[in-house]
Amino acid sequence: MAKKVTAYVKLQVAAGKANPSPPVGPALGQHGVNIMEFCKAFNAQTQGMEVGAPVPVIISVYSDRSFTFVMKTPPASFLLKKAAGITSGSGRPNTNKVGKVNRAQLEAIATTKLPDLTAADMDAAVRTIAGSARSMGLDVEGV
């Protein structure tokens, strides 16, 4: 018989830096999950990623207090800020432009994000990422 899911916990955790302190500890502790077991498993799976990159993770907690988790790709905003070399987006994206990204950078980001996007093909994924870039106050070249 399949285990019954009692909760889904959605978190954004820095790659390779999961530890029992907030936000991980309290979120998992209230469901009775072994926090250190999650931290070790998460850090092991994010070993190949850039350390410190925010990784969205969905943790399924079962009735016997065991868990499984699914990692997503880092947010588009994080990847765009890294590509443009900026620390934050614009407070007024339509008037204040804070950086530039070109089509090659957008394609690289879209390739990374493709498993999590609902885009039908690569061109649609690039347009989706370009829209995110524009809403952050970045100039988009070549799209």
Curated annotation (Swiss-Prot):
Keywords: Methylation, Ribonucleoprotein, Ribosomal protein, RNA-binding, rRNA-binding. GO terms for molecular function: large ribosomal subunit rRNA binding; structural constituent of ribosome. SUPFAM superfamilies: Ribosomal L11/L12e N-terminal domain (SSF54747), Ribosomal protein L11, C-terminal domain (SSF46906). One or more lysine residues are methylated. The keyword Phosphoprotein does not apply. Coiled coil: none annotated. GO terms for biological process: translation. GO terms for cellular component: cytosolic large ribosomal subunit. Gene3D superfamilies: Ribosomal protein L11, C-terminal domain, Ribosomal protein L11/L12, N-terminal domain. Transmembrane segments: none annotated. The keyword Transport does not apply. InterPro entries: Ribosomal_uL11, Ribosomal_uL11_bac-typ, Ribosomal_uL11_C, Ribosomal_uL11_C_sf, Ribosomal_uL11_CS, Ribosomal_uL11_N, Ribosomal_uL11_N_sf. Part of the ribosomal stalk of the 50S ribosomal subunit. Interacts with L10 and the large rRNA to form the base of the stalk. L10 forms an elongated spine to which L12 dimers bind in a sequential fashion forming a multimeric L10(L12)X complex. Forms part of the ribosomal stalk which helps the ribosome interact with GTP-bound translation factors. PANTHER family: 60S RIBOSOMAL PROTEIN L12, LARGE RIBOSOMAL SUBUNIT PROTEIN UL11M. Belongs to the universal ribosomal protein uL11 family. This is Large ribosomal subunit protein uL11.
